């Protein structure tokens, strides 16, 4: 049976846009979504070998669903400018590939896909749907397979579902998936569902009763009781409407002929080569082996004399080796050790442990932190000479991912094939393939480490690498292993307290509205505010009234209901994101949150915190700050919080060599009051609280390249006044003005900027023909040396503090870094010593011509320690 591959293009491009770090051509054209999309497409072509390919796109126009329900997708934010710019380019690339584009006004891509799948089934063609959206699982059958694209550990992976696989995974059939969505709704599409029915309940009901029609015909006889029974009865109308909205239309009026979608491959495709070359997607050009690849490096055969065998660690000699580990969960299943062109596979656990703990052998590894965290002290990896993933990040921090395979392809044009996980037959030697793959990675790692090491030296980044980023790997592993203790009981109480407040606010809103309605529905809220209460609409959308935060802020003084709605939204988000969300990630064994800290994500050098993101714990409201009360020290310990004071302004004073700013910091004066005094021409002692606040906004705004429009908004003044304030500021701070002018010129000339430790950030946006993108590039040029240097300083401090805590044999441990602060869980007998270490190491982390100041506090909870 012939095979057709159809792409849910918007879905895959959207996932790629958010999953791939910002990439752009030299002219500033964003390319990250296209890059990710093409990598997924090429993987699918290789895996599925389709006879036909077509791509479905949404059309920017209302669909029949918008006519059925005005609130459909009303909450969805507009497509980001960077993604919107790539949509037509993606179509150009697909057309050049010979891929047929399918789109129809009034219908969504899913409807086109459903229709094509039906036509394929009728024509005895096997249909494969590639998507990032589970909505398409309703189309799965014995002839139609749904390929869900997912990203795991930096790799694009695919999961294939037919009807049996859907049933096995979710315990409902593909068509029953529609009924599940009818009950639980879908916030991303603003499909309402039944209020109060979540995914778990919806799945359970449909698994038992198979359809909402059956459920509602027998609503009193299927075991529902109490509030759930009432919720279901109240939500009947919404359930049936939601089912209509969630059902893919498989009779979309499109012209489709599979024979017009024949896929012939990419050979000698000059048009495709030219488009990819213009977008500077050179790695895609390499993968496709397109003719005329004059701007791509010649392939180097790094495996020319390659040899490997499975044995023991003594078969590799030398005092420096490469080590690649293969994990099964948190345990090492095998390893490969390389030296030159030779590699040895290790399968014995004792051999691997002995090698890793041998301090006399220097080890070149890749993403060591992950290994340290997984091993969690069972094996102590000693003498880590290099982490090539970190080095590659320093050389080019804008990549979306760092893997040995990708780097080998980029640097040498070498393809390292990753063996399939599945075993096709008993005769397949999967273990041998895996061993050879690991061995090749070990050999490639050695060559990569040498080549990337040369670039580190060329860039003058030795100190940044050897003294900051490489030792930080171990420190971050310690942070992840240590974790932060959470008072789960107190967190539950706080969640309950918020729930009570939300219920009270709900009742107040209903009373003021004169009726009950879905507060979370912008459409219903709009009707209440602008029709029933007759408030003047601030903005209208195609589907109704705008009710976003900006609109509500403007209506705050027009009716008391608005304040209650704003507070309701704030508390609802606080509860769902930070109370319920945090409780879900508390380790049940340690009762701690073990956030993941990553070095290779941000282009500024700042660390990334995920699972959960502890850098986003709210601080602007008292209720938000209360979340920090749930993060506590264990018994017999206290939290010591050390926070750099105005570190970015101090870095600015140093880099700009601004005398006024330098003198203020050296004299320990209030920099914001000094700025107000200088700009307004008044004595320092006469500066008011409001004047200081305005000066503070300017001081920090200047660091981020703030303009008069943004400043005017922040200070609630006219644009003319804001412009005058900025001009007066730059007249007084000559060094800052000169820095701003010189760094922009230098960045335009070189195409990049550097921190004090030579951390590099390339800024292709400066060459964009788009004025707004160029302006963004200038702001990046201004801020990166300051923010990046501040990031380098806090990292240096982390390394020094962690080393001293360990080397001095203290029980106290570094457990968190958030922006400019470090938190140590200190034993009660070591508090003074910990404070001394934090003060000494943080204040001496980097020598500036102004002092680095650290504010310190202690407490049982994170809240108390702030």
Give, region by region, the residue ranges found by the protein language model:
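Active-site-proximal helix-loop-helix substrate-binding element of RNase H-like nuclease domains
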Residues: 153-181, 300-303, 330-458, 468-472, ...
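Conserved "right-hand" nucleotidyltransferase catalytic core of DNA-directed polymerases
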Residues: 235-347, 426-619, 638, 648, ...
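Extended two-metal-dependent nuclease catalytic cores across DNA- and RNA-processing enzymes
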Residues: 24-25, 74-253
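Active-site palm subdomain of RNA-directed nucleic acid polymerases
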Residues: 456-468, 472, 793, 797-818, ...
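Conserved catalytic core of nucleic-acid polymerases
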Residues: 481, 587, 594, 599-602, ...
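C-terminal polymerase-core module
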Residues: 500-507, 511-563, 731-779, 783, ...
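Conserved RNase H-like, two-metal-ion catalytic cores of nucleic-acid enzymes
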Residues: 4-5, 9, 15-54, 70-71, ...
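Function-dense linear segments that define catalytic or interfacial modules
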Residues: 336-343, 367, 395-418, 422-426, ...
């Amino acid at each position: 049976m012939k095979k057709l591959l159809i792409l849910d293009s918007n879905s895959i491009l959207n996932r790629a846009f958010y999953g791939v770090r910002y990439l752009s051509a030299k002219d500033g054209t964003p390319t990250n979504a296209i890059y990710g999309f093409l990598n997924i497409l090429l993987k699918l072509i290789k895996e599925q070998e389709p006879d036909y390919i077509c791509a479905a796109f949404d059309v920017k126009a209302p669909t029949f669903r918008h006519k059925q329900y005005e609130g459909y997708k009303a909450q969805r934010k507009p497509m980001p400018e960077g993604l919107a710019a790539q949509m037509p380019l993606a179509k150009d690339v697909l057309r050049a590939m010979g891929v047929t584009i399918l789109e129809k006004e009034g219908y969504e891509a899913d409807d086109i896909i459903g229709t094509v799948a039906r036509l394929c089934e009728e024509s005895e063609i096997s249909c494969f749907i590639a998507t990032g959206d589970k909505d398409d699982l309703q189309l799965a059958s014995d002839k139609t397979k749904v390929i869900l694209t997912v990203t795991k550990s930096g790799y694009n992976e695919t999961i294939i579902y037919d009807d049996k696989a859907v049933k096995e995974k979710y315990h409902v059939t593909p068509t029953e998936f529609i009924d599940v969505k009818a009950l639980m709704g879908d916030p991303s599409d603003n499909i309402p569902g039944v209020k109060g029915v979540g995914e778990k309940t919806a799945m359970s009901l449909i698994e038992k009763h198979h359809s909402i029609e059956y459920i509602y015909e027998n609503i009193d006889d299927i075991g529902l009781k109490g509030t759930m029974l009432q919720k279901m009865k109240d939500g009947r109308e919404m359930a049936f409407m939601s089912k209509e909205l969630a059902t893919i239309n498989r009779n979309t009026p499109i012209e489709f002929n599979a024979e017009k979608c024949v896929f012939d491959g990419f050979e000698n495709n000059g048009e495709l080569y030219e488009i990819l070359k213009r977008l500077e997607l050179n790695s895609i050009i390499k993968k496709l082996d397109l003719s005329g690849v004059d701007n791509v490096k010649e392939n180097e055969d790094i495996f020319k004399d390659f040899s490997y065998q499975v044995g023991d660690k003594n078969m590799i000699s030398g005092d420096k080796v490469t080590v690649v580990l293969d994990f099964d969960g948190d345990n090492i299943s095998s390893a490969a050790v390389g030296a030159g062109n030779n590699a040895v596979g290790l399968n014995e656990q004792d051999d691997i442990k002995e090698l890793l703990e041998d301090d006399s052998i220097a080890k070149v590894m890749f993403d060591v932190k992950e290994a340290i965290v997984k091993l969690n002290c069972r094996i102590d990896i000693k003498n880590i000479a290099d982490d090539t993933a970190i080095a590659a990040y320093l050389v080019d921090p804008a990549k979306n991912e760092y893997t040995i395979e990708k780097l080998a392809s980029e640097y040498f044009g070498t393809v390292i094939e990753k063996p399939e996980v599945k075993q096709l037959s008993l005769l397949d030697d999967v273990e041998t393939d895996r061993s050879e793959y690991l061995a090749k990675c070990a050999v490639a790692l050695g060559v990569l480490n040498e080549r990337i090491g040369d670039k580190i030296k060329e860039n003058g980044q030795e100190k940044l690498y050897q003294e900051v980023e490489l030792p930080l790997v171990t420190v971050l592993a310690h942070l992840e292993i240590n974790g932060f203790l959470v008072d789960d009981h107190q967190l539950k109480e706080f969640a309950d307290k918020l729930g009570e407040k939300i219920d009270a606010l709900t009742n107040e809103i209903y009373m003021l509205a004169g009726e009950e309605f879905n507060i979370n529905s912008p459409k219903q809220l709009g009707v209440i505010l602008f029709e029933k209460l007759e408030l003047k609409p601030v903005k209208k959308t195609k589907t109704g009234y705008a009710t976003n935060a900006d609109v509500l802020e403007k209506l705050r003084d027009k009716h008391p209901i608005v304040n209650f709605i704003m507070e309701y939204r704030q508390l609802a988000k606080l509860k769902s994101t930070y109370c319920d969300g945090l409780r879900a990630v508390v380790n049940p064994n340690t009762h701690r949150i073990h956030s993941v800290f990553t070095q290779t994500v941000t282009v500024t050098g700042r660390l990334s915190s995920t699972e959960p993101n502890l850098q986003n714990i709210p601080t602007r409201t008292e209720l938000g700050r209360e979340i920090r009360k749930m993060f506590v020290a264990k018994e017999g310990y206290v939290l010591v919080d050390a926070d750099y004071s105005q570190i970015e302004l101090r870095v600015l004073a140093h880099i700009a060599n601004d005398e006024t700013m330098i003198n203020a910091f050296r004299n320990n004066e209030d920099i914001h009051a000094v700025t107000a005094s200088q700009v307004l021409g008044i004595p320092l002692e006469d500066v008011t609280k409001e004047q200081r606040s305005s000066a503070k906004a300017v001081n920090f705004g200047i660091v981020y390249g703030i303009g008069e429009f943004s400043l005017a908004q922040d200070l609630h003044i006219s644009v003319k006044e804001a412009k005058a304030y900025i001009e007066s500021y730059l007249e007084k701070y000559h060094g800052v003005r000169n820095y701003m002018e010189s760094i922009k010129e230098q960045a335009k000339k070189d195409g990049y900027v550097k921190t004090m430790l030579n951390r590099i950030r390339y800024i292709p946006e400066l060459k964009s023909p788009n004025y707004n993108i160029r302006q963004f590039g200038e702001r990046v040029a201004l801020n990166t040396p300051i923010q990046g240097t501040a990031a380098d300083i806090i990292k240096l401090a982390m390394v020094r503090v962690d080393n001293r805590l360990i080397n001095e044999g203290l029980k106290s441990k570094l457990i968190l870094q958030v922006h400019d602060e470090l938190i140590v869980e200190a034993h009660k007998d070591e508090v003074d010593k910990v404070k001394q270490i934090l003060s000494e190491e943080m204040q001496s982390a980097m020598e500036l011509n102004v002092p680095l100041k650290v504010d310190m506090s202690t407490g049982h909870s994170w809240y108390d320690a702030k």
